[in-house]
């Protein structure tokens, strides 16, 4: 069985928090809000390109502010289950934010899909953007890749910061630790 990425866990934490203050039942609209709020993910990038933000989704959620315990509704459960199916279809080991976004728009009757439909966003819109991002090599990085990129950037900054280095023989920084010989 497929699990969920750390980003999806963040999405669900945000969705649960919002559901607590807006009626207690966690729905796709809360998950959609979480997708908007978790930055550097496929879903937030797609939604940002389409002009959908947490503020936009939040306006719909704020209409029903009744504090209570959070219970996930059946549409949200189906969305999470369907996200795992999409992850499997894309040969991904874990369901990620873009799989959840696809699952939300797949169910046209869900509250999240209805919010997006008002912006003329449907399953095909999301799928086309996702396929385009994948074809162009645009993919959110995992934490280890982010750390490696950070160290590469640091190496470049260190190398440029050495103006006396005429021979361009700066030693690379390996995993953030420079070896002394």
Provide a role label for each language-model segment.
Residues 1-181:
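Histone-fold recognition with a strong bias for associated Lys/Arg-rich disordered tails
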């Amino acid at each position: 069985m497929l699990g969920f990425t750390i980003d999806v866990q963040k999405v669900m934490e945000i969705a649960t928090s919002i559901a607590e203050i807006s009626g207690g039942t966690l729905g796709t609209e809360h998950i959609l809000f979480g997708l908007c709020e978790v930055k550097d993910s496929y879903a937030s990038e797609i939604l940002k390109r389409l002009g959908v933000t947490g503020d936009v989704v939040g306006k719909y959620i704020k209409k029903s502010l009744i504090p209570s315990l959070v219970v996930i509704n059946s549409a949200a459960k189906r969305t999470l289950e369907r996200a795992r199916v999409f992850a499997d279809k894309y040969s991904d080991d874990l369901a990620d934010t873009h799989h959840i976004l696809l699952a939300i728009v797949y169910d046209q009757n869900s509250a999240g899909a209805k919010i997006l439909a008002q912006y003329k966003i449907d399953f095909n819109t999301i799928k086309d953007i996702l396929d385009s991002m994948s074809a162009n090599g645009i993919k959110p990085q995992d934490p280890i890749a982010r750390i490696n990129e950070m160290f590469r950037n640091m190496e470049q900054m260190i190398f440029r910061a050495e103006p006396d280095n005429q021979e361009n023989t700066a030693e690379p920084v390996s995993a953030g630790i420079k070896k002394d010989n």
